[in-house]
Amino acid sequence: MKIIKWFGLSVSLLTVIILILGYLYLYVLPTGPEKTPVRPLSVGKDSFVMSAYQHTDRKTIRVWTYKPAQWTPKDSVLFVMHGMGRNAEDYLDAWSDIAERKRILLVAPEFASQFYRVITNDYQEGNLKSFFGWSNPESEWAFTVIENIFDRLNTANDFDLDEYNIFGHSAGGQFVQRMILMKPNARIKTAIAGNAGTYSFVDKAVPYPYGIGT
């Protein structure tokens, strides 16, 4: 096996090729389903696909929604954050009955990834850092994607909502807890983090994601 010097390190040529291809797949090539036209939400179960970031269309995200028949913009909005399995639609279905009874607009973003079992930085860690360890701009944080989705709900439906609630289970619980810590300007009214496997402690001496240090 051929060994080469790369950034001062002795690594195999195969390792370099894998790293380059991984970088291209994760951060250069377009990812996600095709965007759907902007339109108002349908009553009942629905979904749409939008750009995850405001400054580029490179990454898209599917958003599942459930709008009760009697819901009005004066009622509650609840973001439901899925677990490690990235199965947002299942979480939406589990909440739909109570949402109908309580007049809650459900919003379940789907942070899809083929590598969800080995990559955690993009979702439950908020995408503050890339898989390769460098810091991402706040505009590409997963927490910012939630705010972008909330903006899309307002503009596409002529709503004038100014706050939302958010619940997360398992990996979604990690997401919610870290979002509260790292994005305090988010328009969150109430947040519930359930069954999180790990937490970020308010300790700058501990590097993120287990603390808030760099």
Predicted regions and their residues:
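Surface-exposed patches in mature extracellular/periplasmic domains of secreted proteins
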Residues: 111-112, 158-166
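A domain-start/cap signature at the N-terminus of enzymes
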Residues: 6-77, 89-90, 101, 131-134, ...
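Conserved acidic catalytic loop of the alpha/beta-hydrolase fold
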Residues: 143-162
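N-terminal Lys/Arg-rich, disordered targeting/topogenic segments
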Residues: 1-3
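Cap/lid segment of the alpha/beta-hydrolase catalytic domain
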Residues: 112-140
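Short substrate-entry loop that stabilizes the transition state in hydrolases
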Residues: 71-117, 200-201
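Glycine-rich nucleophile elbow surrounding the catalytic serine of serine-hydrolase chemistry
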Residues: 82, 169-178
